[in-house]
Every structure is written in structure tokens, then in C-alpha cells.
């Protein structure tokens, strides 16, 4: 037994000695290869990330904006995400999206706000973090955004009012269905149309203005109620795609085609078909692909520290059955 204990002790001493030799290595292990200058090799640089937060995605207009944003992302080699709430009335949902994007510390953020006043605290947070914010389509009541890529909606709606006055003979009752009274687009389009009528056409009366949230069914019901309440109505202005389609549905369902002049805003297959058929007199089209492209382009330039103008005017056009197939118009229409 004594001999066995001595043997175990010797084995233990030999194992400890082997471990000590292994730790010292008996010499230096070759160092990991490093680039010249002794600095560690860096991982490939990630592309700048720019979240694009839209007012929605349910209308073809927003899909066209997304197409433009994706084109700019490819041209400027940046990564984007494109999202928006299910409804253009969901302010809280969009605010949550902006907060989530901000928490990811992006290179810049593009925002089309559903409420021009709701984002001020988050905009200030973005400013403090040094994250540029670019407005698109619908701006905010704040000086934080570096620039806003959008249509001059007041001027565009004023043109719609001029066309309405011409088509109804300069007198009569008209009405407006708009998408909201909180976003800059909703506010400015109603203002542009209303102000032009009041300034230039004293014999035209705007008998009602209603807001359907851009929802076609709700806008249809509102338009039908207005038509029934005002049997002498001569004209209707739908201030975005959903509003215009709602007006068209109401006019058709009540058998008022040819009796009420319908002027819309934006495009989409249903409006284009109605214009070709004569149910809709014409519409204002924006340049949605251009809006999407310009907002991402501006975001990249702001991230790089380039100077930008306060606004980027993306343009607008009047189209009707006479020019709908012109190449210039076809380039800015979407289906």
C-alpha cells in the first residue's frame, strides 16, 4: 500500500510539471497575423441604414414612393426599410415606428408624418443624437427636419380649383372629401382649393368639407351623404387617391355620372379608368417615385454632411383624357 501511495504521488508531480511546461510553452506561440502597423483587421463596413417611415402602404401611391426609395437605395449603396401604419389615421402606431427606428441609431430617417405636430419630442431626440431627419410627402411643424421632399400641395390644389371653376362654368355648389386635417398634405390641399375658390370665384360656394381618413368606403359614405343633402351640387374634389375613389363610387352608385364634375388627386388604376371613361374630369398627379427617390437621396447627403435646401419640390401635373397618354404624364402615373 505504501509503495502504491508513493507511485500515485510521483504521477501527480509529473502531471503538474507537464502542465507548467504547457503553460510556459517553452517558447512563444506565433502571434495572429495582423495588418501592417500592428492594427487588428477591421470587419467590412456596413452600409448606412436609412429607415423610411411612410403614412401608409395600402394605396398604390405609397407603393410607387417605395419603388423610388428602393431605386435611390441601390444608387447610393444604402440599406433601407419601408413601413407605415395600416391606416393613415394611426398616429400612435407611426410614432411607435419612429421610436423603434430611432433606437437603432440609423444614418438618417425619412418621415411622412400622419400628424404634423405629434413628432416634436422624437424629432428633438433625433436632433440630440445627431440623426438627420428628412421629411417627405407630408412635412411637420418643426425646424428639425433638414429638408422635405414633397409636392407644393397648396399650389397643386389651387390648380384643381381653377380646373373645377372652368368645368362648372364659374358658379355653383362644390364639396371636398379629404383624407385628414392633421397631416400637412390634408391641411394644405384643402387650404389650397378653398383659398383659390374664395379669392377668385365668388359665385362658387363650398358647401361641405369632410374627412374620410383616405378610406374608400368611408369616403364613399361621406360623399353620398353630401350629394343627398345638396341636390344641386355641381362639383366634387377628392383630395387624395382614397378620397377620390370614394367620390367616384358615390357618384356612380347614385347615378350622377355626367351631372357632378369629379376632380381627384394622385392616380391609380381606378382613377385613370374613370378619367378615360369620362366619369372623372381629371386629377392632379404628384411624382411619387420622385418623392421616394429624393427623400432617400437627401437622407444620404445629410448623413454625409452635405448642405440641402429647406424644401425639395418634386412637382405636380394636371391630367385628363386629353393628355393622360402623353409620355410626360405617363412617367408620373402609377397603377
Model regions and ranges:
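Bacterial N-terminal signal peptides that target proteins for export
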Residues: 1-11
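A residue-level marker of the well-folded mature domains of exported/periplasmic proteins
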Residues: 9, 22-335
Amino acid at each position: 500500500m505504501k509503495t502504491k501511495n508513493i507511485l500515485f504521488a510521483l504521477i501527480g508531480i509529473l502531471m503538474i510539471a507537464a502542465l507548467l511546461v504547457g503553460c510556459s510553452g517553452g517558447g512563444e506561440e506565433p502571434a495572429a497575423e495582423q495588418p501592417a502597423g500592428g492594427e487588428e483587421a477591421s470587419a467590412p463596413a456596413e452600409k448606412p441604414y436609412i429607415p423610411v417611415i411612410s403614412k401608409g402602404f395600402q394605396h398604390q401611391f405609397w407603393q410607387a414612393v417605395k419603388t423610388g426609395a428602393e431605386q435611390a437605395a441601390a444608387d447610393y449603396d444604402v440599406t433601407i426599410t419601408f413601413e407605415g401604419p395600416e391606416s393613415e389615421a394611426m398616429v400612435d402606431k407611426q410614432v411607435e415606428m419612429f421610436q423603434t427606428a430611432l433606437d437603432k441609431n440609423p444614418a438618417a430617417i425619412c418621415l411622412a408624418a400622419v400628424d404634423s405636430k405629434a413628432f416634436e419630442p422624437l424629432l428633438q431626440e433625433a436632433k440630440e443624437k445627431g440623426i438627420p431627419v428628412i421629411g417627405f410627402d407630408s412635412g411637420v411643424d418643426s425646424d428639425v427636419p433638414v429638408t422635405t421632399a414633397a409636392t407644393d400641395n397648396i399650389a397643386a390644389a389651387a390648380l384643381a380649383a381653377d380646373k373645377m371653376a372652368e368645368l362648372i362654368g364659374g358658379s355653383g355648389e362644390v364639396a371636398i372629401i379629404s383624407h385628414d386635417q392633421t397631416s400637412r398634405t390634408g391641411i394644405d390641399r384643402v387650404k389650397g382649393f378653398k383659398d383659390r375658390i374664395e379669392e377668385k370665384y365668388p359665385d362658387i360656394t363650398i358647401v361641405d368639407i369632410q374627412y374620410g381618413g383616405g378610406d374608400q368606403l368611408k369616403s364613399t359614405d361621406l360623399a353620398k351623404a353630401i350629394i343627398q343633402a345638396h341636390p344641386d351640387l355641381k362639383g366634387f374634389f377628392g383630395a387624395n387617391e382614397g378620397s377620390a375613389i370614394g367620390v367616384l363610387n358615390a357618384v356612380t352608385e347614385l347615378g350622377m355620372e355626367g351631372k357632378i364634375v369629379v376632380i381627384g388627386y394622385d392616380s391609380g388604376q381606378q382613377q385613370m379608368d374613370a378619367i378615360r371613361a369620362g366619369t372623372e374630369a381629371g386629377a392632379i398627379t404628384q411624382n411619387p417615385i420622385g418623392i421616394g427617390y429624393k427623400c432617400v437621396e437627401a437622407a444620404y447627403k445629410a448623413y454625409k454632411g452635405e448642405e440641402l435646401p429647406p424644401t425639395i419640390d418634386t412637382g405636380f401635373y394636371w391630367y385628363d383624357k386629353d393628355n393622360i397618354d402623353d409620355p410626360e404624364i405617363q412617367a408620373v402615373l402609377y397603377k
